[in-house]
Every structure is written in structure tokens, then in C-alpha cells.
Amino acid sequence: ALKIIDEQPIGPQGSEVGFATLNGAFHRLTGVNMTWYDITGALGMAAIAVACGFGLFGLWQLIKRGSLSRVDRDIYALAGLYRAIGIVYVLFEKAVVNYRPIDMGAGLEPSFPSSHTMLTCCIMSSAIWQFKRRIKSEALRKTTVLLCTAVMAVTIAGRLVSGVHWMTDIAGGVLLSASLMEFYRAAAIR
């Protein structure tokens, strides 16, 4: 639908954008705010640090338990989720749906889905799932869940107002992350 409905050449270099009336109006409303771009960039790095932390946790389980078969199934599922994020990213870098609404110095760059939004939402929502299962202290559990939720919310809102993606690209990142999370949960609890 993104490449069929209301497609118009409103992007840089006359690039075609789906849902052009909606995307164009929202982009004109918000403009470009590189401060929010930088803030969400830092939050994305924080999300990657969380993913690395779970990778180290899996390595710790392997060393402590002495066997690949003794590493928790949900940690393997988490590794699968992270690989799936990478595959989706590469897929949409090759099968371009929309280009960014602004030229960031590298010419036309793919914008759908907002990979930053997808990555942050996937990592943080899977972290929430892990923390709810693993943290015994209710206060610490609630704090980590709140922090993860805040990182996701600020990333989504920040990417919306940064102006480096079309609105539908950010929505696509959120929807793809929700889909990937459902596959992760199904694999983790089997």
C-alpha cells in the first residue's frame, strides 16, 4: 500500500513517496530537528548496549553451565530475534519503499521502515519480556520496565519530530518490531 496509495514525487530529487499527502503535511508541520536525531541516535546506542548485555548473559550461561544445550531457550530465541532484525534491515535496504525526506549528505537513502525505530523497539520490548521473567525484585523490575518503555516512547516521538523519516516509515518500524516480537515470544516459550 505504501507504494500504491497517494504516491507523489515529494521526496529529495523528486523521489516518489507513498501516502504523500499525509507524509508531506506531517513533515511540513514538524520540519527537521537534528537535536532529536542525535538524542534518538544515543538511545539507539543504549538499545544496542542492552542487546550486547544479553549476549554476554548468554555467554555467561554457556561458560557456567558448560554446554550449548544448557543455555536458556529464550536466550537463543533472543539471538534469533537480533538476527531477524538484521535480515529485515538488509532486505529493506535493497527493496526500497521510501527514501528519506531530507538529504543527509549521502544522496538518496532508504527510509522505510525506520530501522532505528524498529531496532530500538525490538530490543527494548524483548528486554522488557526478559526483565519481567528474570528480575525478582519488584522495584528493580518495575524500574527497568519503565526505563525500556521510556526509551521506546522517546525514540518513536523523537524520530517523528526529527524529520529524518516520513511518518509512515516510523509507523512501519513500530509495526515490524511488534511482528518480530510476536515471533520471538512464540519461539521463546515453546
Q: Residue locations for each model-derived region?
A:
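Hydrophobic alpha-helical bundle signature of multipass membrane enzymes
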Residues: 1-111, 118-146
